[in-house]
Amino acid sequence: MIIRRFVRHLSTSKSSIRINAVGIQHLAPSLQNQLFGKSSPRLDEDLINMAKRHLKSNNLIGKKSSLNDPIEIQLPSLQGNTLDEHFYKLGSASLEPYNPLIDELLNLNIIEPQFEFAFQSGWTRYAPGEPSEKVPYPLEDSYFFDVETMYKVSQYPVMAVALSDKAWYGWVSPYLTEESTTNDHLIPLNTFETEKFIVGHNVSYDRARALEEYNLKQTKAFWMDTMALHVSVSGMCTRQRGTWIKHNKKEQENTMSVASIKSKVQNEELQELLDSTSIEDPMLEDNPWINKSSLNSLERVAEFYCKIKLKKDIRNSFATEDPDELRGNFDELMQYCAKDVFATGKVFQKVYPKFKKLIPHPVTLAALKDISSCILPTTTKWEDYIETSERLYQESRRMIEKNLHVICEETVKLKDDPTKPWENDPWLSQLDWTIDPIRLTKKGEIHKNQKLPGYPNWYKQLIVKNELKLTTKTRTSPLLLKLAWNGNPLYWIQTQGWCFKVPKNKTEEYEKLNFVMVSLKKLSEDPGFESIRAEDLKNFTFVKVPHPDGPSARVTNCMTKSCLGFFEKGFLNSQYPLAKDALQMAVASSYWTSSRERIMNQFVVFEDDMGYILPQIIPMGTITRRAVENTWLTASNAKKNRLGSELKSLIEAPKGYCFVGADVDSEELWIASLIGDSVFKIHGGTAIGWMTLEGTKNEGTDLHSKTAKILGISRNEAKIFNYGRIYGAGIKFTTTLLKKFNPALSDAEAKATANALYTATKGISGRYDKKSIWYGGSESIIFNRLEAIAEMAHPKTPVLGAGITAPLQKANLSTNNFLTSRINWAIQSSGVDYLHLLIISMDYLIKLFDIDARLCITVHDEIRYLVKEEDKFRAAYALQISNLWTRAMFCQQLGINEVPQSCAFFSAVDLDFVLRKEVDLDCVTPSNPDPIPCGKSLDIYQLLQQEDIKGADFPRTMHLNDVHYRKRTPVIEMFDKAVDDKTRKFMVSLQIAQDKTEFTKWKRSRGELIVH
């Protein structure tokens, strides 16, 4: 039964303002009761007093905190007694239609096809014991699926294979059977009529070839990606990947050598011995996790889980541009496709149960359905955008190159100057001015087969097919442009990259600034050592041009975005204005040059003036379960000097629709601070928690302002340091980054500043009970908490209880414990929990409020829905409720039955007709000179004043009583139960000690707790 009721009003009563013991405003009583019930949360006075002492030592107690009008709205009823029960039921209800379909595939006895595929267009069904029959689409509702394309010709499919529990299916494009002269055919799957569960490896590629998916209305298909399941269960972190590849290569070499020996051994007993012999591998002893993972391709994953060896050579057939080659090899190619389907099915049956065991909460699985069903609508402007961006890029490139060629041609004329002026020029002397003797025929004529007789070698190397090939990327260009660092000429050294030479008497000056000197030994090992002039070696020191990635990296191109800052600050200079023009062109084009191929290869399906892009999302593409996609999830925001950077704004809502979305404010920073606050069981109990919730730029009490002050950098730059630190990055990272922002800092200054930051934030490292412990910093409590979670035998995210991947579980680690990666996992994976909760809330409220909306795209802490225009305010309202429920779930799971009002709701919900970071971003770029009109942005107060919300009736509940809830103990509660109350408080006292003296005092007073 649905009950309707008047839903909202703003409280004008000051008595409804609730402030906690450290000055954080909580929700109004009515909202508090709806979320957590009427019983008041119990507070521990000892912990409160310790929190106050900790805040006082960080100069935060008594600081100004904000008070806002309490918000009192009638929420839809929770589905159960707790937020965990509520979300469990929401997730389970969303999955309910798909569970029997999943079971069908899990119980399927998968056998490879024992028949030839019919060469006929459309779908053909092959059921055991029955004649093959032509069908409009697969008749069953769950199946494994794989698609193949002639990718050099078109992104449209040419063939596909599916396997259900009843039959095999083959689909053939009418283009391949020559019933159509065009190749623009999509695959019908009938996904609007009934729920479908479709499994593929990197299934977003297959989904993009499904006919029904190109529709504003969302289909009932659940696209399940075995690659995503594998990554979440057995994926490696970035730092492990190189080691795995190195080991795998070595293993293959060893296997080949054993096979070679075996082939030459005639004795049967020796052959058996070789079969049973495993080669001892010291790398495995240090890295036992290697055997717990694989790379992500189907070939690797099938071998890892199922010992299936896929032969992938035949896939090269799809690189052809001649369809006759496919027609002539049709059945073999269909069998290849079927083998991939077979392997995908086997992998799914192995990895899905592991996934359910490791990540059991239904919210995670349910959220994958929407993430895998994203859609990006566009218009014919898409084609104009590509044409304009490419044209401007080519025009700019040609202009710069033309001017560069002029300099080159002027320079080469010096060859005729008898004084050889290049010999005393520090740049031009690096070029090879050798002119090979002109070969003459017997008649005294110049021999025809000579390349540019009479020209120096450096110039001849630039001529390809009688054309000068010289760009800003060419190694010769910085020398022709006479680039210098602080007036010191640049010099190319193969093993060190671009350097500059400074007089010996200035070497110490650069050493103090932590520049990297190139030793004589390293110079002597360089292939070009002999070309360095003796007087240069005697009178100059060679110094490396700084690289953003640190001292060991080498700069190979000075005309890139990473060097722009050096030009702007005057470190890099040239006598030619063209140098800066070229660099600015390189910077302006940097986005387009790095993204153009991906953008041009987007598969856009047009219907009249509307186009649709199905983003190629891997819904769990990293070990933290973040979604991955290489264009839309990494697209930058529009910048006035970046060609093509208005990309996102090309995603435009169709007429009658708009985008409704929001960014989660300081999502991962808040999660980290909440994990710390859970120690005191009060919001804002830690310094970082208080700064995250109440700190302001004006007061200088927010985290970024504090860090900026310590480091002497801008607040914006400070954000990078803060997030890096929270993710587990150390002092080395901070020192390197400081040098990047200010190359003039000496090594000692950078290290001292970084140490000061870490002492003030992470704190001092102490020892207690044979374990290390951080104390004295504003973030010590958080880091101790995060490290403790990361050091668990089976770490779980605090909210949804998602487990860490096998290669990062403690039992599979040895000499390298990958602690930084595991801390990073705890935060980022919790951020993914947040997103999944938000999506499932919206999924429920869209149905409850009867809103015409679907998920458009999500990028980590951003979420955007495509919504019917008349539903936009109700969709915004649903988003605000979803955020409130999600924050409340986080708080409750971390042991605090309160929500701070400052973060309960999105700071704003955006209503817009294009995708962009901010509604007032005009998206003007070199390729888009016309500003895009602004959208709307509404905070919760403004939203509640809209006529569609003000005084409206909203449904209160939906019948979900059939869902059985399995109660669980919160992860943090289990974690805290490991020690008794007195010990826990003692450990808190150690962590909030301000210095070594106080820390030692607390260690000695082990039994007598003082909290005042």
From Swiss-Prot:
Its cofactor is Mg(2+). It comes from the Eukaryota. It is an enzyme of class 2 (transferase). Its main location: mitochondrion. Gene3D superfamilies: 3.30.420.390, 3.30.70.370, 5' to 3' exonuclease, C-terminal subdomain (1.10.150.20). It catalyses: DNA(n) + a 2'-deoxyribonucleoside 5'-triphosphate = DNA(n+1) + diphosphate. Keywords: DNA replication, DNA-binding, DNA-directed DNA polymerase, Magnesium, Mitochondrion, Nucleotidyltransferase, Transferase. GO terms for biological process: mitochondrial DNA replication. It is found in: Mitochondrion. Pfam families: DNA_pol_A (PF00476), DNApol_Exo (PF18136). Its EC number is 2.7.7.7. PANTHER family: DNA POLYMERASE SUBUNIT GAMMA-1. Belongs to the DNA polymerase type-A family. In eukaryotes there are five DNA polymerases: alpha, beta, gamma, delta, and epsilon which are responsible for different reactions of DNA synthesis. This is DNA polymerase gamma. The gene is MIP1.
